[in-house]
Amino acid sequence: MDLLTLFKVLILGAVEGLTEFLPISSTGHQIIVADLLEFGGERAMAFNIIIQLGAILAVVWEFRPKIFEIVKGLPTQSNAQRFTRNLLIAFFPAVILGVLFADTIHEYLFNPITVAVALVVGGIVMLWAEQRDHVVSVDHVDDMKWADALKIGCVQCLAMIPGTSRSGSTIIGGLLFGLSRKAATEFSFFLAMPTMVGAAVYSGYKYRELFQSSDLPVFALGFVVAFIFAMIAVRGLLKFIANHSYATFAWYRIAFGLLILATWQFGWVNWTAAAAA
């Protein structure tokens, strides 16, 4: 592994870890940063699958007490059974739409301009959601009904558009549907587990010919870096939301999206050429 490749792996692994669970779109940031670093092609596709697994492992590790509690209680405890049912219900819409439209969306929408527009629009929606009166009807994830889970699962499908943010859509959707900020955030984290693992397994099998043994050091380093930075991001977000709203992330999305659009409009960066590279 040469120094340039090492640099790209460290940057992309850190970007994935930091952005995967913040409501600012990890896919959008990966598209932008990968284009700037000229890291594309089949190797990059395989690399992205691996680093996403590193990020999701961080959430599994962080919430392992809750996971063990659910697994242990599944045979007899109604709370564990209801929580598992809600996760499956919320996961189902993404499975259907992902299988049907993932390739089409990747072909036509995975470009920096789509990301920029989605960042701005998502930021505006996030600001609106935070400023409206928030009536809490579900204070804890264990109190969710199946209808709450289904609505959040449908909203999660919006994240198939790069720049929207899976965590952003599920968290803000949860707030709009009456979940407390803590419940919406925790359910978003738990929903990420089957969603991201399912997507990674599906993509990994579909593009299995892209994985080469010679890339193992690159993949391993990216996996570890993504895990470390995702752990930092998850713990930081859980502490942050205890006393803050998501408005900070909304303004960041808007500013970042407008910056990308400005560089495109004034010709400072040829994003069309970058996306095609």
From Swiss-Prot:
Name the reaction it catalyses.
Answer: di-trans,octa-cis-undecaprenyl diphosphate + H2O = di-trans,octa-cis-undecaprenyl phosphate + phosphate + H(+)
InterPro entries for the chain: UppP
Which pairs are disulfide-linked? none
A GO molecular-function descriptor: undecaprenyl-diphosphatase activity
User: What subcellular locations does the record give?
Assistant: Cell inner membrane
* Known function: Catalyzes the dephosphorylation of undecaprenyl diphosphate (UPP). Confers resistance to bacitracin.
Q: What is this protein called?
A: Undecaprenyl-diphosphatase 2
Question: What organism, scientifically named, is this protein from?
Answer: Pseudomonas fluorescens (strain Pf0-1)
